[in-house]
Each structure stands twice: as C-alpha cells, then as structure tokens.
C-alpha cells in the first residue's frame, strides 16, 4: 500500500474513497471489503466507502455521491447553492450534474437528483472541492427550474445581496448560454439588482412607475426605500 497516496486521497475527498480508486492508491478491493466487514470502514454508496466508523460529515456524504456518479460529476443547483452559502440549510436531496454523454441509466443514485449538461467544463468552479458549479451558473441553473419569475429573481437578489457574486458576472454567464428562461426579463432584473433593487417589492415598485431612494453606501442589502410622490 502506498501510504502517502492513500492518505492524500482520503484527505482530498473528506475520507471517502471509491473501490475503483483502490489500485491507484495501493488498496486492493479485498482489503476494502475486509475493513467494511470489521466495522473500521462503512459503505456510503455502491462501491464507495468512508474510511472511518461513525456518522459521516456532510462533505463526506457529498463526496460519496460524486464518486458514485463517476468522473466529471459536479454538485449543482440546490446543493451548489448550499456550498456557495446561498441557502442556510442543506437539502436532504443532493443535486448534481454529469456530462451529457452519460446515459441516465448509468447514473441512478438513491437520494440524488441528476442533471446532464454538455457545458460542465465551462460551468465548473476552477478550485472548489468537492467539485461544484460556479456561483453564477448555480444561480442560472436554479432560475431554469424556478416555478416562477418571482422565484428566479429571488435567487439573483440572494446571490448579489449576500455578496457571492455581482450583476455583471451573472450577466456574462447568462450571455454564454444558448437557452435561458425569461432572458429578456432577466436582463432588466439583473440590472435592477445590480443597482440595489434586492427585493421583489423594490423590483415591482420600479417597474410600476415609481422610483427608489438609494440606500447610503454601506447600508444593508435591500435597504433602498420607495420614494413616494
């Protein structure tokens, strides 16, 4: 066993390891099975283990799902929003995206929603681990499945209001997409959010013919006030 390679693998993946990775780090499948039977390791997904006993951390669970999904998989949508701190509580369901070349039947994981995309290389964050979509593309993915434009705009407000990204970055990411729901409305909405209209009330007031008194520099996001005449 290559102790260094094995240790590095576990450290990089929050102590999750796939059976297929064993030969690369000097651990044979029988050794893995023995450790699971002895209770030193535990099975998290089919062919994926946690190299410890006890309750797995959230990051270990996410890594296990990604390893089960196979090469190229990234966390996306609500789970990516969790990683980017756009939501405060993790969902019981993990959401990820795999390359479009993967057949849906090849990627069926209990408790996981799978999307497919041919643009993963462009939308994947260059540094985050576990692999995850960029915050701008996470927002756009959530907009694509939003039940209404109000819900879509709320994601934009949240991302900008929490200072996770900017209006310009969201706009550039949207320009790179061939298909986008509510594209025309979103162009306007992104501009409004960039100007400080970080709530649906403010957005509707602006487009109802009113104006907004801009909040002082440094005021909390969404602190603009309607200026009635």
Predicted features by range, described:
Residues 219-229:
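Short acidic loop-to-beta-strand element that houses the catalytic metal-binding Asp/Glu
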Residues 1-184, 200-206, 213-219:
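Short gly/ser-rich loop at a beta-strand->alpha-helix junction or flexible surface loop bordering the NTP-binding
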Residues 188-203:
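A short, highly charged nucleic-acid-interacting micro-segment common to nuclease
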């Amino acid at each position: 066993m290559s102790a260094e390679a094995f240790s590095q693998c576990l450290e990089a993946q929050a102590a999750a390891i796939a059976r297929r990775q064993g030969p690369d780090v000097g651990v044979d499948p029988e050794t893995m099975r023995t450790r699971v039977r002895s209770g030193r390791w535990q099975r998290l997904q089919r062919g994926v283990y946690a190299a410890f006993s006890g309750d797995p951390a959230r990051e270990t669970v996410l890594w296990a799902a990604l390893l089960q999904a196979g090469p190229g998989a990234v966390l996306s949508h609500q789970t990516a929003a969790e990683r980017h701190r756009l939501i405060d509580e993790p969902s019981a369901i993990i959401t990820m995206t795999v390359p479009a070349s993967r057949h849906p039947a090849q990627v069926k994981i209990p408790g996981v929603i799978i999307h497919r995309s041919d643009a993963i290389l462009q939308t994947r964050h260059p540094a985050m681990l576990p692999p995850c979509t960029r915050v701008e593309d996470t927002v756009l993915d959530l907009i694509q499945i939003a039940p209404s434009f109000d819900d879509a705009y709320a994601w934009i407000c949240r991302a900008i209001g929490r200072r996770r990204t900017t209006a310009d970055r969201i706009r550039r990411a949207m320009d790179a997409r061939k298909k986008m729901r509510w594209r025309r409305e979103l162009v306007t909405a992104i501009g409004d959010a960039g100007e400080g209209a970080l709530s649906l009330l403010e957005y509707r007031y602006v487009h109802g013919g009113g104006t907004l008194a801009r909040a002082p520099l440094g005021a909390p996001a969404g602190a603009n006030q309607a200026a009635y005449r």
